[in-house]
From Swiss-Prot:
This is ADP-ribosylation factor-like protein 3. Its main location: Golgi. Keywords: Cell cycle, Cell division, Cytoplasm, Cytoskeleton, Golgi apparatus, GTP-binding, Lipoprotein, Membrane, Myristate, Nucleotide-binding, Nucleus, Protein transport, Transport. It is a peripheral membrane protein. It comes from Chlamydomonas reinhardtii. The gene is ARL3. The lineage of its organism: Eukaryota, Viridiplantae, Chlorophyta, core chlorophytes, Chlorophyceae.
Amino acid sequence: MGLLSLIRGLKKKEGEARILVLGLDNAGKTTILKALSEEDITTITPTQGFNIKSLSRDGFNLKIWDIGGQKSIRPYWRNYFDQTDALIYVIDSADSKRLSESEFELTELLQEEKMTGVPLLVFANKQDLVGALAADEIASTLDLTSIRDRPWQIQACSAKQGTGLKEGMEWMMKQVK
């Protein structure tokens, strides 16, 4: 067991987990976070910087960090990697033109030393939109099956309809416990 795993284990005993939510701009990160918090999702504005939410799930206090996905903000993502217990990466399933850009960013993230072994949940968001790619198509495009150094899961969802979020979070909670 490495030092990072040991530190993460200590945090789990305290009943806390730090979750990082990343993805390209307009993927639906903030909408997902608000839906999980049971907040109004009718008016969402692009995140400039970050949002932090505390949620209680299964006796755990989750600190969820939603970081803006604009190209100008992405270089700062690494400032938030310390003590991350799980990564939620959000994909806009209806925006196939930006899938390769999203793949590049995810690949870069997974190569970061501070993210070694951190469980990955990919939310294939916006499944309610016409032309949205299925989760298995996105998994194939992102080459998720080649990931061997961490547990991962892809979950089809629609933040606006609230579908798939519960299932994704249940998987994630099993990983951080």
